[in-house]
Amino acid sequence: MDVLVYGCVNSAVLALMAVGFTLVYGISRLANFAHGALYTLTGFMVWTFLWKLHLNYALAIIIALIMTSIVGAIIYQTLLVRIRGMEASEVIGSFAVGLALMEFLRWKGFIGHAYAVPGFIKGATSIGGVPVDFQRLVIVFAGVIIVIFLWLFTHYTRIGLALRAIAQDEQAGMMLGMDSDKMSMISMSLGAALAGLAAVTIFPLGSITVESGYSVLIYAVAVCIVGGLGSWPGAVVAAFIIGYGQTLTDKFIASHYQAVLAMGAIVVTLILKPSGLFGKQKQLEERV
């Protein structure tokens, strides 16, 4: 029973980590390798607002998410828009931006020990005899809400429909008067905010360091590749597969093999089905 419960929590954590990465790639076909750094940046902003500026918890989160979304838009407008369509340059450029953000955090003094913030809700409950703290339930709830919100946003709002149109056929969308670069900037900004939302939701479970961005990026990429780049249903399914795999690894082998499992999932997927579980082979061939 503990595998079932904690596997669900781990899956929600991975889904939260990956949904922003999936959104950006699905719309702009841009692999944002600064995703992990944006996650870390948001976590440290919340920590600073709470412990240095003594802001209200909710206000600290809102300000941090707004600032992270602005940073995402700036990254796109100042760099990525100039190299869009050049796959190698996109990967190298976005990864370099991520490294710069993490070095900025180190320069600001976030080095050495790990940093922590309190949970939203204290206390615990029992599910099927398995003790689960309320913060983990918040993560599961947040994952469900975010997936539902994104589906409603992309199906019932003007901007969301425009984003879907650009994702499905960029040339046709531009012929209808849509600004492809503007839509990509919006997706990058929203993806950055989602990375930040994952941080503020997951951060209270433990602690965060500057290096946390690397592991978040690895897990986000693993989920997206296994599920199919740009596929939200695929990302959710892949999050459950890897999440439960990590739980079983932790229970029967050792917790430090969880990252190995994620990397192994990437390798196996690229060998057996390069387009991923829900990816489209035709789109993959067009990219290659």
Regions found by a protein language model. Give the residues of each.
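Membrane-interfacial amphipathic/re-entrant helices at transmembrane-helix boundaries
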Residues: 1-17, 45, 53-60, 86-91, ...
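Inter-helical junctions in multi-pass inner-membrane proteins, predominant
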Residues: 1-13, 132, 153-158, 184-227, ...
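Pore- or pathway-lining transmembrane helices of multi-pass membrane proteins that form conduits
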Residues: 76, 81-106, 213-225, 253-273
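Cytosolic-side transmembrane-helix boundaries in multi-pass membrane proteins
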Residues: 88-89, 168-182, 253-288
